[in-house]
């Protein structure tokens, strides 16, 4: 089995059409084109490299765990990484992050258009790029945090309109960062939170 055949099989496990709908990758029906687009998107020479869990070390809040979901998760994380590249951040500063947590907590009563720009700016000053992404079916993801170069990326999903979930996910990811869990192999599930 050659690399293209193997990659075509792997491409079927990714939510290609949904990713294209969000504008993350070009639309196509051709399976070889899909593979080429996905290789470019993930910045790999072969999609089979995505099977190596070391390629993306993340800490995340997931609602379920499925193998197909792992590929959707990788796609979502890659989009967070791409968006974060356009966000200028100061050097990572944990003391400042800990200092601003109480101020961020006071924003829970504000509307998103009021708090989003302010939180993004405050976190950028701590070396954290905050990005918001659409929910990708199969990823069961609420949020993720990981290192990318000299910054920490926090990605949050726009899944659901529940403000409580947003704030829980944001503080959950910030706790991962403060506690040094950024780069954990597996995220937390709803079951973990109940235990």
Set out the residue ranges of the language-model regions:
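Conserved binding/catalytic microenvironments
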Residues: 50-195
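Interfacial/linker helices and their anchor residues that mediate assembly or domain coupling
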Residues: 2-91
């Amino acid at each position: 089995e050659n690399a293209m055949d193997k990659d075509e099989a792997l491409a079927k496990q990714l939510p290609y059409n949904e990713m294209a709908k969000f504008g993350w990758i070009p639309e196509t029906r051709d399976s070889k084109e899909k593979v080429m687009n996905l290789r470019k998107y993930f910045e790999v020479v072969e999609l089979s490299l995505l099977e190596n869990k070391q390629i993306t070390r993340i800490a995340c809040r997931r609602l379920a765990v499925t193998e197909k979901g792992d590929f959707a998760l990788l796609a979502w994380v890659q989009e967070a990484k791409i968006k974060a590249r356009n966000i200028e951040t100061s050097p990572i500063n944990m003391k400042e992050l800990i200092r601003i947590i109480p101020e961020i907590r006071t924003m829970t009563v504000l509307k998103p258009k009021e708090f989003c720009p302010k939180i993004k700016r405050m976190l950028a000053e701590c070396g954290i790029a905050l990005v918001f992404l659409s929910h990708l079916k199969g990823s069961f993801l609420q949020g993720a945090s990981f290192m990318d170069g000299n910054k920490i990326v926090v990605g949050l999903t726009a899944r659901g309109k529940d403000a409580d979930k947003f704030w829980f996910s944001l503080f959950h990811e910030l706790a991962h960062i403060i506690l040094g869990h950024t780069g954990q192999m597996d995220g937390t599930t709803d079951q973990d939170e109940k235990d």
